[in-house]
């Protein structure tokens, strides 16, 4: 995997050159994905906003994610992450959206998944999703690994569209 600084610069270069925008919904990373995107000079030309709907109760207000929206989707599934990404993209009116849902730990087995489990969805000109398992139960370490994985997936998808 590329170094995170290189990935962030690559994302910024592509988005700026194509005049495209991105928004983020993240739960277990607590803003780390958004912070990474904002850390690059020029971020105001591509970063529209991010939300951290950590409590389920705010997802409806912030993203129009309701029980009916996700009825039939398994928690922590790639389909669930894609639903969040698509709603984020639509709600924030961006070209791209990144959604991350995860269990950072150290407590376990939420929805039957162990700490270190995460799903990422990318919605945009091309969509992609991934299930990530770190095998770790250290909260801060998982948060950073989830962030890096989400940004790497986004950079890969952007590159595929670029070529």
Predicted regions: what they are:
Residues 1-163:
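Short alpha-helical segments enriched in small residues
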């Amino acid at each position: 995997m590329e170094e995170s600084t290189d990935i962030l610069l690559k994302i910024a270069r592509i988005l700026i050159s194509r005049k495209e925008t991105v928004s983020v919904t993240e739960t277990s990373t607590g803003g780390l994905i958004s912070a990474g995107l904002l850390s690059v000079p020029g971020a105001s030309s591509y970063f529209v906003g991010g939300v951290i709907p950590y409590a389920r109760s705010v997802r409806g207000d912030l993203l129009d994610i309701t029980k009916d929206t996700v009825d039939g989707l398994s928690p922590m599934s790639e389909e669930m992450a894609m639903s969040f990404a698509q709603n984020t993209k639509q709600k924030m009116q961006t070209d791209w959206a990144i959604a991350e849902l995860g269990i950072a730990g150290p407590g376990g087995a939420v929805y039957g998944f162990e700490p270190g489990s995460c799903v990422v969805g990318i919605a945009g000109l091309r969509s992609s999703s991934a299930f990530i398992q770190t095998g770790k139960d250290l909260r801060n370490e998982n948060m950073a690994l989830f962030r890096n994985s989400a940004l790497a997936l986004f950079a890969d998808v952007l590159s595929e569209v670029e070529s």
